[in-house]
A protein has these predicted regions:
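Active-site/substrate-binding loop(s) of hydrolase catalytic cores
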Residues: 26-83
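Active-site donor-binding loop signature of nucleotide-sugar glycosyltransferases
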Residues: 42, 166, 388
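Metal-dependent de-N-acetylase/amidase catalytic core
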Residues: 9-20, 64-233
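Short, well-ordered, mixed-charge alpha-helical segments that flank or form enzyme active sites
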Residues: 48, 108-111, 368
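Glycine-rich phosphate-binding loop and adjoining beta1-alpha1-beta2 segment
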Residues: 1-39
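A structural motif
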Residues: 219-570
Length: 570
């Protein structure tokens, strides 16, 4: 990854942190690249058999560090709950990251039985018992850093976050194609090391349980998937009355809005803060029938630990009038009455209907679907459960050619589908679709040129997707991985009224790609700038000022715009 010999020496030093804590830091530089590792060295099992879950949840818990052989750190440190939060927040403030990766703070509930052995899971959940508190400490530190920076600097720090599922990967279909899996395996092999490596470190040369071919041979298959806890596409693009591209996203755990500097300029201005945080990187946006923008987000309503509540809630921000100011954020709660179940609620998905209603959908703690509807008069109805089971997060909500609501989700067995039978009617679970088993990433869906609903997704471990509508068709050249977005657009040939399906996603190297059409001769187009988004890119396709726009967020927390032309070369 650094372009250096795997045994290149690291520069070791001591870092002094809040609370009198000291940590070891290792630095490696190679040309324009550099890496810094900070080892807090909190013991997995501290004095008295104390583990990090107790440091999160039990007041008064203290854990000691474990000094590594040969470490420049001379004395162990002690961590209480707030000490660890202060240390993490201090590290963030010192180094000002633009992208923070975390573990899953709210893992799925998991039944453990003969068919689903517990293995390395914590009781009742699909992740390791240490992963969850580490993620919670990180998110609490993020919130503290943002609050302190905002008070000091009058603005929130600019960064984005990505949270990864953990042992969840064992429980669901694998979603990485062979080429991407091979890249991941090479990195993990280097991390795992081997006892016979001559690395010059008396403490050892890797996490040997992850070395060699062990991860690929492990029946649990953790390596064979990469699932996001918040699998939405951000930023979410739309347009304003002047024809400028507008994008909504989450930056520094706060909602923000970017506007294009001028119609068609291809550049966003500075972000405008909309507040609402601390928010997960999960945002859904719709424009209601009156032209007002409505934003939905998932908020960390409480990150207390130490025996206090950890709460999540869906929140909404609504414009007073088209292109006008926003009202205050409003909490919509969750469909769950128990806070522990509320933590497992998924990312919001929404769709606006011509009758003035706005339909909000979320995945529930029991892996089904729930909805809440804003009526045309602006009043929100109660949460309602719509049934279903064993779906993954990453819902797709859209209207069909008749204006009826559809919701689609990747299930363990097939695609799960809810829909209206008539305009204004309830959204209800449909009979099993019988479609091939999805790999688990969010599904692409659009009204096809023939007026039917077309679904686009990859099956487990597949490199190319298929389009499922009246018939099924493999999209043979659209090689990649992850979520796919779809939209029907004007055909590049320019023939009057001719339409085709447009796809956007990531190629096998993670770069954004689009493809006009799904036939055997259609080829993907890639951006001249080799744009690589954090998470999934978003697609806007309209018949007005914008045409086709792809929007994404770079690792430096800067949004970009790509307006692909059908003549671009792959």
């Amino acid at each position: 990854m650094m372009g250096l010999n795997q045994f290149a020496p690291w520069q070791r030093s001591v870092l002094r942190l809040p609370g009198g804590v000291t940590a070891e830091t290792n630095t490696l530089a190679g040309g324009a690249r550099s890496a810094r590792l900070i080892f807090l060295n909190i013991a997995m099992l501290s004095d008295g058999g104390v583990r990090i879950p107790a440091l999160w949840s039990t007041p008064g818990t203290v854990m000691r560090t474990l000094l590594a052989t040969g470490s420049p750190v001379a004395h162990p440190s002690s961590y209480g709950h707030q000490t660890l939060v202060d240390v993490l927040a201090g590290i963030m403030d010192r180094y000002r990251p633009t992208l923070i990766h975390t573990l899953d703070p709210d893992p799925d509930f998991q039944v453990h039985d003969l068919l689903h052995p517990k293995d390395n899971d914590q009781p009742g959940c699909s992740d390791h018992r240490d992963h969850t508190p580490v993620a919670l400490f990180t998110w609490k530190a993020i919130a503290q850093w943002v609050a302190a920076s905002t008070r000091r600097d009058k603005s929130a720090p600019r960064f984005t976050t990505t949270a990864f599922r953990g042992y969840y990967n064992q429980r669901w279909p694998h979603n990485l194609p062979p080429a991407v899996l091979a890249q991941k395996a090479r990195v993990i092999k280097s991390y795992g090391g081997a006892p016979d490596w001559d690395c010059g470190n008396a403490a050892g040369c890797g996490d040997y349980s992850q070395g060699g071919l062990r991860p690929l041979r492990n029946r649990k298959g953790w390596i064979r998937s990469t699932h996001y806890r918040y699998p939405t596409s951000l930023p979410a693009p739309t347009t304003d009355a002047q024809g400028r591209l507008v994008a909504y996203g989450v930056l520094g755990t706060q909602a923000v809005r970017w506007r294009e500097t001028a119609p068609g300029s291809g550049r966003f201005g500075a972000p405008r803060g909309l507040g609402g945080g601390p928010l997960a990187p999960a945002l859904a946006t719709v424009r209601d029938s009156a032209g007002r923008q409505v934003l939905f987000a998932l908020r960390f309503a409480a990150l207390a630990g130490q025996g206090a509540g950890d709460l999540r809630e869906i929140v909404v921000l609504e414009q007073r009038r088209p292109d006008g100011p926003f009202r205050a954020w409003t909490g919509l709660g969750t469909p769950e009455s128990d806070p522990e179940h509320g933590r497992r609620v998924g990312c919001p998905a929404a769709v606006a209907t011509p009758d003035g209603r706005v339909h909000l959908f979320v995945r529930t703690a029991d892996k089904g679907l729930a909805t809440r509807v804003r009526e045309a008069n602006g009043r929100w109805g109660p949460w309602q459960r719509l049934g279903g089971t064993e779906i993954q997060d990453g819902l797709t909500a859209l209207l069909d050619a008749e204006g009826l609501v559809h919701v689609l989700a990747p299930g363990r067995d097939t695609v799960h589908h809810w829909a209206q039978e008539r305009a204004g009617g309830p959204v209800a679970l449909r009979r099993p679709s019988g479609l091939p088993r999805p790999g688990g990433d969010p599904l692409g869906a659009a009204v096809a040129p023939d007026g039917t609903l077309a679904l686009v997704y990859r099956t487990p471990t597949a490199t190319v997707p298929a389009v499922h509508g009246e018939t099924s068709l493999t999209v043979r050249h659209f090689e990649g991985y992850g979520a796919i977005a779809a939209h029907t657009v004007a055909e590049p040939s320019g023939r009057r009224e001719a339409k085709t399906l447009l796809l956007v996603g990531r190629d096998l190297g993670g770069e954004v790609q689009v493809q006009y059409g799904t036939g055997p001769d259609a080829k993907p187009l890639r951006s001249p700038g080799h744009l690589t988004p954090v998470g999934a890119p978003a697609l806007l396709a309209d018949d007005g000022h914008q045409g086709v726009c792809v929007v994404g967020l770079s690792p430096d927390a800067t949004p970009w715009i790509w307006r692909p032309r059908p003549t671009s070369r792959a």
